[in-house]
Amino acid sequence: MAFVRFMKTIAPRYPELVILGDLFDYWIGDDAHPEAQPVIALLKLHAATGRRVIVMPGNRDVMLGAAFARAAGAELIRDPIVADICGRKTLLAHGDQWCLRDVAYQKFRALTHDPRWQAMMLMKSVEERLAIAKQARAQSESEKGEKSMADMDVVESAVAEAVKAAGVDLVIHGHTHKPAAHMQNGYERWVIPDWELDGPDGTAKSGAITFLEGARPQIQMF
């Protein structure tokens, strides 16, 4: 698994680890994921060395909560947020809020981010929540074939507005899983890759964006 390899090889080189969502394929509540314990244990072990573990929920794991954070030794942050990255003000986001061409997705996103909807979901049994999550994932995968790549990508003008409002010249996001560095008019937009780009031969193919003091960010593929 690419994430495990990353945690054992690249992450220990840096004092902070920031995950911008979609660490898990789905998350139906902190009480319902025993299969996630190996990943949580890796994060906890990383945090125990004195390094910071910072997690922003994504669209797949929007319901990550306080119990997860305690178990993983992590800090949960809101989306979006301005952070100081090696002395540079940076806008961090999952990125799906800027995929405005996909109107149906934006309606679904608004629903899943509603605290009332989340509270209602948590009142259901684990089995009911799991069935709902699997149905949503299946529908999402089915609809991908009906949408163009442009429809599923960010709207650059929306990103530009967010960058201007935040007063930054650098934005880092995920969601689209199209790792690249975009040099726009007046700002840089860096896109992180998916964790699950493992090749058919089992070779982990993923990456991360890394920072060093005084240097430009870099996309490290591994």
Model-derived segments and spans:
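Charged/polar, solvent-exposed surface patches and flexible loops
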Residues: 5, 41, 45, 66, ...
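A broad, low-specificity signal for short, low-complexity segments enriched in glycine/proline
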Residues: 16-17, 38-39, 49-57, 130-135, ...
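Core catalytic region of metal-dependent phosphoesterases/phosphodiesterases
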Residues: 1-85
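Active-site-proximal loop/helix segment associated with metal-binding centers of metalloenzymes
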Residues: 95-155
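Conserved beta-sheet core of the metallophosphoesterase superfamily
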Residues: 71-78, 89-91, 96, 101-108, ...
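Short low-complexity stretches enriched in small and charged residues
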Residues: 9-12, 44-52, 94, 125-129, ...
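Glycine-rich loops and low-complexity Gly/Arg-rich segments
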Residues: 8-12, 41-45, 79-82, 101-103, ...
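Short C-terminal domain-edge/linker segments immediately following a structured domain
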Residues: 12-18, 47-51, 85-88, 120-127, ...
